[in-house]
Design a protein with these regions (language model features):
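Terminal amphipathic alpha-helical/low-complexity segments used for targeting or macromolecular assembly
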Residues: 1-132
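Conserved phosphate/pyrophosphate-binding and hydrolysis machinery centered on Walker-type P-loop NTPases
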Residues: 123, 150-151
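A structural motif detector for beta-strand N-caps
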Residues: 135, 139-143, 147-149, 155, ...
Length: 165
């Protein structure tokens, strides 16, 4: 059976520049901030923009019952308000996992957003997060939409690896 290489696809120059700038910004922020609290705030703010199209801020209105679903949505974008499956496991290392949880939540929520369906952006986004989550991630790694993992801190992914769901 013949082996066919992946085709090289690109967004528009404007799209590529914007996507690259966003990923570089996130990479810089996650490199600067290792504390779970700060990473959670960064993730919350970015998800707020991705899902709701506006910056995080303002007070939630807890008095109006009609506002409750929107409050639930806003609060659910913050990784501190989410529990992930690995947190229930007895073999979890809480010290290693705590700074990674916001990034794992970001990965999962990115993949569930319309933006996460963009493969060009997604490959680069997941590789960037992988540098902060995994024990090691090689060069030219492509991780497709929908791939999930439990901890991340014990994973090594070598160069030129492609992972599908």
């Amino acid at each position: 059976m013949p082996r066919y290489p992946y085709r090289e696809l690109k967004p528009t120059p404007e799209g590529e520049a914007t996507y690259t700038r966003w990923i570089t910004h996130l990479d810089t922020e996650f490199t600067r901030h290792h504390k779970p609290e700060l990473r959670s705030e960064i993730v919350r703010d970015e998800l707020h923009q991705l899902y709701l199209g506006r910056p995080h801020g303002g007070k939630l209105n807890f008095n109006m019952v009609t506002e409750l679903p929107f409050n639930v949505l806003q609060l659910s974008l913050d990784p501190r308000n989410a529990t992930l499956e690995p947190e229930y496991y007895g073999d979890l290392n809480p010290e290693k996992y705590a700074p990674l949880k916001p990034l794992i939540w970001f990965w999962q929520m990115f993949d569930r957003s319309p933006v996460g369906l963009n493969h060009w952006l997604g490959f680069r986004f997941r590789a960037m997060l992988g540098r902060h989550i995994f024990k090691h991630i090689g060069k030219n790694v492509k991780i497709f939409h929908g791939v999930e993992f439990s901890y991340g801190y014990n994973l090594t992914i070598e160069d030129n690896c492609t992972i599908h769901k």
